[in-house]
Every structure is written in structure tokens, then in C-alpha cells.
From Swiss-Prot:
GO molecular function, one term: ATP binding
Protein name, entry field: Argininosuccinate synthase
Claim: Cytoplasm is one of the keywords in the record: yes
Amino acids binding L-aspartate: T123, N127, D128
Amino acid sequence: MKREVKKVVLAYSGGLDTSVILKWLQDEYKCEVVTFTADIGQGEEVEPARAKALALGIKPENIFIDDLREEFVKDYVFPMFRANAIYEGEYLLGTSIARPLIAKRQVEIAHLTNADGVSHGATGKGNDQVRFEMGYLSKDSTLTVIAPWREWDLNSREKLLAYAEEHGIQIEKKGKKSPYSMDANLLHISYEGGILEDPNAEPEDSMWLWTTKPEDAPNTPEYITIGYENGDPVSLNGEKLTPATMLETLNKIAGKHGIGRADIVENRYVGMKSRGCYETPGGTIMLKGHRAIESITLDREEAHLKDELMPRYAKLIYNGFWFSPEREMLQAAIDTTQKNVKGSVKLKLYKGSVMVVGRSSEFSLFNPEYCTFEEDAVYDQKDAAGFIKLNALRFIIAGKARKK
């Protein structure tokens, strides 16, 4: 028996899946639907979603289209990059980090419109259902969550198309459809499905939409300088940029040089392994630059502890725990380390690679007087003998005990 819901806020893209969901909610739940379309830099026009929603009977006052690009980068991407977060050593969490923001805004719109439910288009097999719903529940557990993919029998594209045709849902024809399931925002674009379901099959070159094939990238390297303050990139080649403009600009520069591709088999939170290909050009540069500026501004033990915490932090984001107290606790600790992460990093971009070639900071802990290979007057090398002996004391004691 279906729960009674009067008004539902749907995360709506205007595409086939969410347009079918919109109509299905109206028919199955007999409820009023509010559509929410987030512009987080996915590269598609979001206004057509308004026309599609109107055509499906949504009242103009129940259509929300919000530009969240600056908030997305400033309050979600940048904090994540302060942690140098990478899931399972390769994934820069481009999809994972976008879902909490969308979920949060859905709940806010539910409160604005007096809605008593929220809905999303994530399937029952993937991680996104968890990410959306953990966000909903953390912000307002009284809202009814409707996940159509866990309820209906429209479990194929053919069935969705048939439903759309039967109910007069206009689906734009864009020529040959990509064989991949794709998701994009300012941080990345992802590809799943198709031949990628064979982990041994190499995808065709035409799949990659954001980055030049590294072999075809410019034959001349490009040098850029990123300025950092409190761990965040704030300027490019001396020009101050907003967070969203910074990431957008780095995407274009890095993409031209074939930087940021990844082909990964990852462990989903729901238990299965999944293969995905990702392009994260600007994020790849930001991560490299951030680690470089940290290398001269963080204390050794501070940096090492931060690296130990990073996998746990990344796992929390991947699994949908952005709003959890443990993620917020880790974030507070991470942000404390960033107060002196200020300076500039020079990077060399060339045919798919990004290399740090310079770094400087007024808070640099790198002191040439101590680390020089030439003669110095500040470091007595004889002191190293006692340091080594004390550190090896437990080995010495254990060795003597074993000889008894």
C-alpha cells in the first residue's frame, strides 16, 4: 500500500527518466509535484526543463531552477580538496560530492512549498540512492522519500520510452544516443555501462568528451601558476577567480592537454564492483597543486596524520555521509591545518601529465640552511648518532633478549 503524499519535490533533469518519474508520481501517488533542477555545471541548458515541466502540468510556481555552481565548488568541492580526498586511490569523487547539495536544496524547497515528500531518479543498484536519501534524512526525517526505481517495473530504457509515448511525454531526439550512462557537473563527467561492463574492454576514443587524447595534445608544455589561501585555489596566473570560474577555467586548460582521465573498477557501497571512466581535468590539477603547497607549509606529523585520515574521509563522502557528525569532525580538523596553506604553485602541463615545478609560501617550513648539501653552520651531523641510537633502542633490547 502506497503512503499518502500530497506534494513531492522531485530532483528533475528534464530527461527521459525524471520526466517519466514526474508523470508516474502524478498517476500513482495522485500528488502535486514540484520540480527542482540544479545547475551545477553539467554543461547542458537547464531552462528546457522548465518547458518540459510546464508541458507535464506543473504549475509555474512549482518549478525551481537554481544556479548552484558557486555554492557547489565553494562549499563542497573545495572542502573536499582541502582533505586531498581520493576514493580507493583513484576516484576524485565527482558524482559523490554533488548529491548532498542537491538533496539539501530539495529539502529546503520542500519547506518553502509545504511539500511532505521528496523523490529522486537514482536506481536501486547504485550509490546515489544512498547519497540522496542520507541527505534527506539528515535534513528532515519527516519527509516521505519516494524512489520510483525501487517500486515500478519500468526497468529498461525500452519500457521507459514506451511509457513516455503512452502518456504523451515529449522526449527530445538528439540523433544517435550515447551507449553510456553519463553524469556531469563542474568537477567531472562520468561514463558507465555499454562496453565498460566488460572490465577488460578499452573504451573508444570518442567516449571521452572533456579531454584531448594525450597523444594528440599540444607538443609544447604549458606552465600555469595557482595561488592558494587557506588551502583553496584563489588565483590563476595572478588573476583572482571565483571558485566556480577557477574550476571551469582549469577544466578547459587541463582538458586541452589530456589531463584527468581515469578508468576505474570501484567497490560500491551497496556491495558490488562497478567500472566507471571519469574525466576530472581541473580537479586533477587542483589536487596536485594543493599537495604541493601543503608539502612546504604543513608540519611533518600534521601532514602524515592528515594522510592517514584521508581514506576515511573519502569513504564517508563516497558512501553518502557528507552531513554526518564524523565527516564534520574530520572537516574541522582538516580545516585547522589549512590556515597557513598559502602561497603559489607552478605546474607544467604536457600530454596527459601535470608536474609540479615550483612552490613558494611566506609560511614555508623549507629552510635551505638546514637541508643544504653544502657546508652549513646550523646542523651538527654528530647529533644524528644519538637520534638513531635512541630510535633503535627497542631493536637493540629485543635483539639481546633473543640471543639469551
